[in-house]
């Protein structure tokens, strides 16, 4: 069985289809999507429907991202968050034109069921953004940090790579897991179009919202 982690999609349906075609998914493979399915490109609603359909054929895990929280709130209450509207929400709302109320309800259920993180059988952690508890995600007191935190990644960016894992200076919160996979902060921010690996953490948000990668 193969496991594939797929970073932030942000309404990029065509790019998503290209990725899955290249992977040549087989029965028994596992797809882990890292959140932020909407807001960015013009086909957010279509991405959500596509993911729902894919989950009927393959084993999928869908993590919740901060943009998914915004879209969920809009689908549930029709309230438009001003920050969301300015950061892709407008395009997402437009993508839902032509979708029936029943289809929108189906998408709301999809968003409401999204887990905040996933730990697989190999003790690999998958979550959208980060966490702050030194005792691991199970002890995180502020659940919204799973899809908003950047302190984990920013800590790693300035970490001295000479620090050994058994050192007292090695970050305690990343010691709990074999590997950690996150999105949320585009690697293009650091002039890199590929995933970035620091210590046992992989940032796989390669900027699909901006450059479609």
State where each predicted segment sits.
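Active-site glycine-centered loops adjacent to acidic/histidine catalytic or metal-binding residues
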Residues: 8, 35-36, 65-66, 183-184, ...
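Histidine-centered catalytic micro-motifs
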Residues: 9, 127-131, 180-188
């Amino acid at each position: 069985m193969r496991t594939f982690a797929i970073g932030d999609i942000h309404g990029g349906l065509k790019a998503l289809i290209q990725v899955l075609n290249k992977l040549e998914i087989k029965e028994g493979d596992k797809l882990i999507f890292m959140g932020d399915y909407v807001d960015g490109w013009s086909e957010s609603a279509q991405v959500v429907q596509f993911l729902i359909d894919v989950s009927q054929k393959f084993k999928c895990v869908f993590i919740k991202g901060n943009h998914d929280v915004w879209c969920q709130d809009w689908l549930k209450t029709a309230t438009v968050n001003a920050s969301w509207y300015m950061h892709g929400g407008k395009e997402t709302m437009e993508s839902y034109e032509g979708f029936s109320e029943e289809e929108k309800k189906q998408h709301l259920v999809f968003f409401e069921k999204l887990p905040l993180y996933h730990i697989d059988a190999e003790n690999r952690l998958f979550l959208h953004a980060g966490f702050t508890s030194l005792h691991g995600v199970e002890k995180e007191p502020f659940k919204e940090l799973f899809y908003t935190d950047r302190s984990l990644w920013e800590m790693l960016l300035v970490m001295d790579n000479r620090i050994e894992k058994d050192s007292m200076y090695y970050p305690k919160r990343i010691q709990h897991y074999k590997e950690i996979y996150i999105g949320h902060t585009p690697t293009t921010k650091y002039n890199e179009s590929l995933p970035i690996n620091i210590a046992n953490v992989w940032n796989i948000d390669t900027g699909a919202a901006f450059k479609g990668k």
